[in-house]
């Protein structure tokens, strides 16, 4: 029963974390920047936000973004962080699909428990790789951006990335280390067989 609960916890945690990584990848509020001194920006009420795909200006009644489409003039760290976040988002899809197939409520024919166990281990590895890509990108980007401009604060995109990466890392570790062995994956299923006393007699394996 404990292994079953940990499998579900690992799946839910990883799924929520993956959504956070996707939000971070697709939004541009990574860091809040200031083109002047911080007191001047606050007095003018003019701040900027910088992300992977656009630089934005936020002022009273104005929000304008300039897409970063010219790859040749983009800083190397922006391109590298783009690649890392895209890789993290893509890795999450097969990891979540694999975790779906190993949940206790899902049964694919009469497959042995070792097959589910191997899929769970692969999903756990993918989730840890996802988390590492997101962690590197969300730390590297603000450090390098600080060298180019004054950073006032971190944006919600960066916080979503940190939370998502940690959740994926926790979910992957739970799946790899705590969700049981091949025997546990084989026992966490329910099946039905006909009994002599009634036409439909439910029988369940020990969990």
From Swiss-Prot:
Transmembrane segments: 2-22, 83-103, 123-143, 158-178
Keywords, alphabetical: Cell junction, Cell membrane, Membrane, Phosphoprotein, Tight junction, Transmembrane, Transmembrane helix
Gene3D superfamilies: 1.20.140.150
Extracellular side: 23-82, 144-157
The keyword Transmembrane helix belongs to this UniProt entry's keyword annotation: yes
Phosphoserine PTM positions: 193-194, 197-198
PROSITE patterns recorded: CLAUDIN
Subcellular location field: Cell junction, Tight junction; Cell membrane
Cystines in this chain: none
InterPro entries on file: Claudin, Claudin11, Claudin_CS, PMP22/EMP/MP20/Claudin
Signal sequence interval, chain numbering: none
Gene Ontology MF: a single term: structural molecule activity
Keyword hit for Protein transport: no
Membrane topology: Multi-pass membrane protein
Principal location class: other
GO aspect biological process, one term: cell adhesion
Cytoplasmic side: 1, 104-122, 179-207
Family: Belongs to the claudin family.
Annotated function: Plays a major role in tight junction-specific obliteration of the intercellular space, through calcium-independent cell-adhesion activity.
Subunit and interaction comment: Interacts with tetraspanin-3/TSPAN3. Interacts with OCLN.
PANTHER family: CLAUDIN
Protein name listed in UniProt: Claudin-11
UniProt organism field: Macaca fascicularis (Crab-eating macaque)
């Amino acid at each position: 029963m404990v292994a079953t609960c940990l499998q579900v916890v690992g799946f839910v945690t990883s799924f929520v974390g993956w959504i956070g990584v996707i939000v971070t990848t697709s939004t541009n509020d990574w860091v809040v920047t200031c083109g002047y001194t911080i007191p001047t920006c606050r007095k003018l009420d003019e701040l900027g936000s910088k992300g992977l795909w656009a630089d934005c200006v936020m002022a009273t009644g104005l929000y304008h973004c300039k897409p970063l489409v010219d790859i040749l003039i983009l800083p190397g760290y922006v391109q590298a962080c783009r690649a890392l976040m895209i890789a993290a988002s893509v890795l999450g899809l097969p990891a979540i699909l694999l975790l779906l197939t190993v949940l206790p409520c899902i049964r694919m024919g009469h497959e042995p428990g070792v097959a589910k166990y191997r899929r769970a281990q692969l999903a756990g590895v993918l989730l840890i790789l996802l988390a590492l890509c997101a962690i590197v990108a969300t730390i590297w980007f603000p450090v390098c951006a600080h060298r180019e401009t004054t950073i006032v604060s971190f944006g919600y995109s960066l916080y979503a990335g940190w939370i998502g990466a940690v959740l994926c890392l926790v979910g992957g570790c739970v799946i790899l280390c705590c969700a049981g062995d091949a025997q546990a994956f084989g026992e966490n299923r329910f099946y039905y067989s006909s009994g002599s006393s009634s036409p439909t007699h439910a029988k369940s394996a020990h969990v």
